[in-house]
Design a protein with these regions (language model features):
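Bacterial Sec-dependent N-terminal signal peptides
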Residues: 1-34
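Beta-strand elements within well-structured catalytic alpha/beta cores of enzymes
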Residues: 39-51, 70, 96, 152, ...
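His/Asp/Glu-rich, glycine-adjacent segments
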Residues: 101, 107-289, 298-305, 426
Length: 539
């Protein structure tokens, strides 16, 4: 009897062991099926001035396979904020690509003042390199640290193919970084796809397209008419006018005006068409390694007008942008497969000329040329004859450092004297010197200024006006309304089937959190200047 009981116990124990082993193997098998291989293709899409509220307002005019697909099947952060002053698309794109602000990444705006050459120039101007299909000289050397493209190159031991396409040189170079195969943009004068000899690979199929099928072979093809005419202007709830038909030809002085084209849907269509050639002829995502394609598109106003001056055009830009993204997704799905692709899409957080101020609300105008002329006279009275002012640009006064050195003066002393004088001008609420930004203890206001500043290109004085005041470069120029902070937050979307759970997050996030979150998703290091941790991965 005891023997039978012992045998029964032994059989039961053996059965439990077998069941446990089977369950463990089953769990292991299930876990193995869940783990995905590295993506074949990563596509980063940055859309200049993309607004979350405009996307929501146009839901009834968007298709199901473009922006809606990304938003319905991706992780969506609806409100990305930039802790910056006077933000432009270039500075915003640098923040998104590096996970750090200009104080660390070196890129304050598309155009910067060169103290040595005493002139404005591209932030990426570099005379050591010549252009491909352009007269410009560029390199990414002004970008401090790495970006996402650089980190993918490092992770793959330089095997990944990385390309960037954008309307302008600065945008293309920012996304490409230091180690990409090529950065490509549309040249303002020739309308050809251009690059810089800094990058080693300017694909032959792009060269052929420049000569065989240029962007426009004649003026008649350079036209823009709306998809919809009639009906309400959905993006502007307080505008009572209906959508109006329009036709823009982009011809100026009998030549095609390519800078105008860059503020229309035509540039987005051209970039998507070229990206399809990279996927097809360049075989991106089809070589056994993870490749990357960075695209910059446009969703701002036509010719940089205010929204109320061109509402029909602005709404059409969004409708066509949605169609372009649908076309891109279809091309990717037909070649690499969307299930093998990670896509992230971001806006730039800035809006050019959002709404003009009413005349009654304008308190006054601050004219930069008058300020610098009077300031120069004041410094002459203090320190003697000389050209004391270099430039006034983007709310910043640049002193002439050569004159200060020749007079054997301390730069900090001259900055202090100049700041005290400018502070007496009508409409000025604050004047902050570079020394304060670089060396004084932080407060919330100084932190924002510091984020926006970089010692390599920053001015000596930063001038802030009182509410209602407007900047004018000189008496003949148009007034520039003050930038409103975070007036139009844009989204950040991560589309990664099987890796991220579709979800909408309305809580605002900082723009520097986007890059480490994308890096975590694609399993690479965050860029070298990034100090944030990924969203959704916090303890």
């Amino acid at each position: 009897m005891k023997k039978n009981s012992y045998n029964a116990t032994l059989l039961l124990a053996s059965a439990l062991v077998l069941i446990s082993s089977f369950n463990a193997l089953s769990c292991f098998g299930q876990e193995k099926r869940v783990v995905k291989q590295n993506p074949k293709l990563i596509i980063g899409i940055a859309v200049d001035q993309l607004r979350s509220d405009y996307i929501q307002a146009l839901q009834n005019k968007l298709g199901e396979k473009g922006l809606k697909k990304l938003m319905n099947e991706g992780l969506v952060y609806e409100n990305v904020t930039f802790d910056l002053d006077n933000i432009d698309a270039t500075a915003a794109l640098a923040v998104l690509a590096t996970g750090s602000y200009p104080f660390y990444n070196g890129v304050t705006s598309a155009s910067v003042y060169n103290q040595e050459m005493i002139r404005q120039q591209s932030v990426f101007f570099d005379k050591q390199y010549i252009g491909n299909s352009t007269a410009g000289n560029y390199s990414p050397k002004a970008l401090i640290g790495t970006n996402l493209a650089d980190e993918l190159k490092a992770a793959s031991n330089n095997l990944s193919k990385v390309y960037s396409i954008a309307p302008n040189a600065e945008e293309a170079i920012l996304a490409a970084g230091h180690t990409a195969d090529c950065a490509i943009w549309l040249d303002d004068k020739t309308g050809k796809w251009a690059s810089t000899t800094y990058y080693r690979d300017f694909p032959q199929y792009v060269v052929r397209q420049n000569y065989d099928t240029p962007l426009f072979v004649d003026e008649k093809k350079a036209t823009w008419t709306p998809v919809y005419s009639g009906g309400h202007i959905d993006i502007m709830p307080y505008c009572k006018a209906d959508l109006l038909p329009f036709s823009h030809t982009f011809v100026k002085d009998r030549r095609i005006a390519y800078p105008w084209i860059k503020t229309s849907p035509i540039i987005n269509k051209a970039i998507v068409e070229l990206s399809k050639q990279f996927i097809k002829q360049g075989r991106l995502g089809q070589s056994g390694t993870t490749d990357m394609l960075q695209l910059t598109l446009y969703a701002g106003t036509y010719q940089h007008l205010s929204a109320e001056e061109s509402p029909s055009e602005l709404q059409d830009i969004y409708v066509r942008l949605d169609q372009n993204i649908e076309e891109l997704l279809s091309a990717v799905d037909g070649s690499v497969g969307l299930h093998n692709t990670i896509i992230y899409l971001t806006g730039t957080g800035n809006t050019e000329n959002c709404v003009s101020d009413l005349t009654e609300t304008v308190a006054g105008e601050f004219v930069g040329s008058r300020c610098t002329a009077l300031l120069n006279s004041y410094l002459i009275s203090l320190y003697g004859q000389g050209s004391w002012i270099g430039s006034f640009d983007n709310n910043q006064i640049y002193l002439n450092h050569k004159t200060i050195e020749q007079k054997n003066l301390r730069l900090a002393d001259v900055r202090h004297s100049a700041a005290e004088f400018v502070m007496m001008f009508s409409g000025v609420s604050e004047v902050v010197s570079a020394d304060q930004i670089l060396h004084e203890d932080n407060n919330a206001r100084l932190t924002r200024l510091r984020n926006s500043y970089n010692k390599n290109f920053g001015g000596d004085l930063l001038v802030e006006l009182q509410p209602g005041w407007q900047f004018k470069a000189d008496d003949a120029s148009k007034p520039q309304p003050q930038t409103r902070h975070d007036v139009a937050p844009g989204p950040a979307i991560i589309f990664a089937p099987g890796l991220v759970t579709p979800k909408h997050v309305t809580t605002p996030i900082d723009a520097t959190e986007v890059s480490p979150t994308v890096a975590k998703t694609i399993r690479i290091r965050a860029p070298s200047g990034c100090k944030r941790i990924p969203l959704g991965f916090k303890n």
